[in-house]
């Protein structure tokens, strides 16, 4: 299963920090790629620097048409999840999503849509699932973290990358970092 995150509405200059955090959280919790509808070299460079130091093959990409990308993704039997505070409760829909993902011979790829500003109506219509992580305003970073943790059932929290140049050794008393 491949998990991609599509960031809609990134506002260049205004959303650099939060979009970087969405990307890094996506990577840390198991996603394979983040897609933007416009390029932001600051975000791209930050993501690539983290991957270089901390390992893995997480990708940053830009799509010309987000609608076309979603259509193509769905055509290839992928599942599209839109994170929105107006969607179905994650506690009630997650089991159904996991079952759908495992349906058939191969597990299905997943595309998660996450907005920065008001998300166009078409995103709601194109999504297979409109999912809420609570019905109160909060950070999209929190929403993507919770969804990915539920999707991977906690297995991505302590994932190790063999090509990492930096590795944290958990400790209850002090910082322990291994530089390779």
Curated annotation (Swiss-Prot):
Entry-linked InterPro entries: Alpha/beta_knot_MTases, tRNA_m1G_MTases_N, tRNA_mtfrase_aTrm56
Subcellular location: Cytoplasm
EC category: transferase
Species for this entry: Methanococcus aeolicus (strain ATCC BAA-1280 / DSM 17508 / OCM 812 / Nankai-3)
Name listed for the protein in its UniProt record: tRNA (cytidine(56)-2'-O)-methyltransferase
NCBIfam families: PRK03958.1
Pfam family, one: Trm56
Keyword Nucleotide-binding: no
Catalytic reactions on record: cytidine(56) in tRNA + S-adenosyl-L-methionine = 2'-O-methylcytidine(56) in tRNA + S-adenosyl-L-homocysteine + H(+)
Chain positions recorded as S-adenosyl-L-methionine binding sites: 83, 115-119, 133-140
Signal peptide: none
Function summary: Specifically catalyzes the AdoMet-dependent 2'-O-ribose methylation of cytidine at position 56 in tRNAs.
One term of GO molecular function: tRNA (cytidine(56)-2'-O)-methyltransferase activity
Keyword Cell division: no
Subunit structure: Homodimer.
EC number of this enzyme: 2.1.1.206
Assigned GO CC terms: cytoplasm
UniProt record similarity statement: Belongs to the aTrm56 family.
GO biological process: tRNA nucleoside ribose methylation
Record keywords, A-Z: Cytoplasm, Methyltransferase, S-adenosyl-L-methionine, Transferase, tRNA processing
């Amino acid at each position: 299963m491949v998990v991609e995150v599509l960031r809609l509405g990134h506002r260049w200059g205004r959303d650099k920090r939060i979009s970087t955090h969405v990307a890094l959280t996506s990577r840390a919790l198991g996603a394979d790629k983040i897609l933007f509808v416009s390029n932001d070299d600051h975000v791209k460079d930050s993501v690539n620097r983290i991957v270089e130091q901390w390992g893995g093959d997480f990708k940053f990409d830009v799509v010309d048409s987000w609608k076309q990308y979603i259509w193509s993704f769905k055509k290839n039997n992928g599942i599209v999840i839109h994170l929105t505070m107006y969607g179905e409760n994650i506690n009630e829909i997650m089991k159904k999503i996991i079952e759908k993902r495992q349906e058939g011979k191969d597990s299905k790829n997943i595309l998660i849509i996450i907005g920065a500003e008001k998300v166009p109506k078409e995103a709601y219509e194109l999504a297979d699932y409109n999912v809420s992580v609570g019905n109160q305003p909060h950070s999209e970073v929190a929403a993507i973290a919770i969804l990915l943790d539920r999707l991977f059932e906690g297995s991505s929290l302590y994932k190790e990358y063999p090509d990492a140049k930096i590795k944290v050794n958990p400790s209850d008393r002090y910082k322990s970092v291994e530089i390779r």
